[in-house]
């Protein structure tokens, strides 16, 4: 903000990048912005980062809130190893801006790309991935936050099998009192295949079990190589769930606040649950036992994150002393702000305060407006492959070091995913 920026053309858009960074590759683009990979050319090791440009921040209030939510939560969760780390924030012209730049940890791919590669994953991989997701969720939930959009595409993975949760734009608070959850159902566009049945059926309350259901869907996808509930639409999605889990009992149905939804479920033929052994005959029985607990239809009977971490399937990784909780509850009070100018001020303050924190120096009193320079064209993502290794002398000895690798030797070749970090 207080120095001249380099200008690059990324996905046909101009990106203004801090002068000590060189953009090296386009990574992904989506409805909310674009992402590129860059290197810190001023440092000895030339560390790599992902730079996300969130666009059209003030075109709609829902996008403004989403951007602010993402920034605040990334900062709040910055200290956990299984949540993507934010390094820096930037706004080019603080007096008139519609974009925010986020400098983040660069990860090689996401879990969606790994699964889609079609190459074999081992049970040891499944254990490690699910354990890391649950560790991240424990930290998130302890701050009274529900992620609400857990899916393989929002789980970033490095070559050493280190996994990190990203994309908090849809997150909300998890108070049992609906009045304390501003906008809980607003913008609920989480991917249908990982959406909990209580969301689809309008249960009378929502809580952390929403994320637990998504973890179950992810485990099933790891076991089978394809989504378990691949619904084409709302009704098809619900029917797939009921076909697998069976007809819910009357006590569960009583929690559905929508009378029409209750009537629909009751109108269907009674179905018995299909054992997960039928879907995954070669799977570890302990994995299937955990899966059944993660995918309990009734959220009140669904396993909690803490209990899931203690499940025998994850025993090789579980260490209560190494599974921290967040030291403070996240403040969602900004969700009540409706004035666009006030939201703009809050975003600017958030960026300035974080920049001050990471630089350990005062705010620039008069931040200068960027002077545009000729844009440099950036190479597009070439979909180059890389390996996720799982060779190690001991799982258990490496657990404390968070070196997520394995005794057996296996390499996962997969294509880079264009939408990672986006």
From Swiss-Prot:
Residues 411-422 have a biased composition (Basic and acidic residues). Signal peptide: none annotated. Residues 359-422 are annotated as: Disordered. InterPro entries: Kinase-like_dom_sf, MAP_kinase, MAP_kinase_CS, Prot_kinase_dom, Protein_kinase_ATP_BS, Ser/Thr_kinase_AS. CDD domains: STKc_MPK1 (cd07857). The modification Phosphotyrosine is found at residue 188. Its EC number is 2.7.11.24. GO terms for biological process: cell integrity MAPK cascade; intracellular signal transduction; negative regulation of glucose mediated signaling pathway; negative regulation of mitotic cytokinesis; positive regulation of calcium ion import across plasma membrane; positive regulation of calcium-mediated signaling; positive regulation of cell wall organization or biogenesis; positive regulation of transcription by RNA polymerase II. ATP binds at residues 27-35, 52. Regulates cell integrity and functions coordinately with the protein kinase C pathway (pck1 and pck2). Involved the regulation of wall architecture, cell shape, cytokinesis in exponential and stationary phase, and metabolism of ions. Belongs to the protein kinase superfamily. CMGC Ser/Thr protein kinase family. MAP kinase subfamily. This is Mitogen-activated protein kinase spm1.
């Amino acid at each position: 903000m207080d120095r001249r920026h380099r200008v690059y053309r990324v996905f046909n858009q101009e990106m203004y990048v801090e002068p000590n960074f060189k953009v090296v590759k386009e990574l992904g683009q989506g409805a909310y912005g674009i992402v590129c990979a860059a290197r810190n050319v001023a440092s000895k090791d030339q560390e790599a980062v992902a730079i996300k440009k969130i666009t059209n921040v003030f075109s709609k209030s829902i996008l403004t809130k989403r951007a602010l939510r993402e920034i605040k939560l990334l900062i709040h969760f910055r200290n956990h190893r299984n949540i993507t780390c934010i390094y820096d924030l930037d706004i080019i012209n603080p007096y008139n801006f519609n974009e925010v730049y986020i400098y983040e940890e660069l990860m090689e791919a996401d879990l969606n790309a790994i699964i889609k590669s079609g190459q074999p994953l081992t049970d040891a991989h499944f254990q490690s991935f699910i354990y890391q997701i649950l560790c991240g969720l424990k930290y998130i939930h302890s701050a009274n936050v529900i992620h609400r959009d857990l899916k393989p595409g929002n789980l970033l993975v490095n070559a050493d099998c280190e996994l990190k949760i990203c994309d908090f734009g849809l997150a909300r608070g998890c108070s049992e009192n609906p009045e304390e959850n501003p906008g809980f159902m607003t913008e609920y566009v989480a991917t249908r295949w990982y959406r909990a049945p209580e969301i689809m059926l309008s249960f009378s309350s929502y809580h952390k079990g929403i994320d637990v259901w998504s973890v179950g869907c992810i485990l099933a996808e790891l076991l089978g190589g394809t989504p378990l509930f691949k619904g084409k639409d709302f009704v098809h999605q619900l029917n797939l769930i009921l076909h697998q889990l069976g007809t819910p009992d009357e006590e569960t149905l009583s929690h559905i606040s929508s009378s029409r939804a209750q009537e629909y479920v009751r109108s269907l033929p009674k179905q018995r649950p299909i054992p997960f052994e039928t879907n995954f005959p070669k799977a570890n029985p302990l994995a299937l036992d955990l899966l059944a607990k993660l995918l309990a239809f009734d959220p009140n009977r669904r396993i909690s994150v803490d209990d899931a971490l203690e499940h025998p399937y994850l025993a090789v990784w579980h260490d209560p002393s190494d599974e921290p909780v967040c030291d403070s509850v996240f403040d969602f009070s900004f969700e009540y702000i409706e004035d666009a100018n006030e939201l703009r001020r809050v975003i600017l303050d958030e960026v300035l305060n974080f920049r001050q924190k990471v630089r350990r120096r005062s705010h620039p009193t008069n931040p200068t407006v960027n002077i545009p320079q000729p844009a440099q064209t950036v190479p597009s993502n070439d979909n180059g492959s890389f390996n996720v290794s799982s060779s190690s002398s001991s799982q258990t000895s490496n657990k404390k070091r968070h070196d997520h690798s394995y005794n057996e030797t296996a390499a996962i070749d997969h294509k880079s995913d264009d939408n990672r970090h986006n």
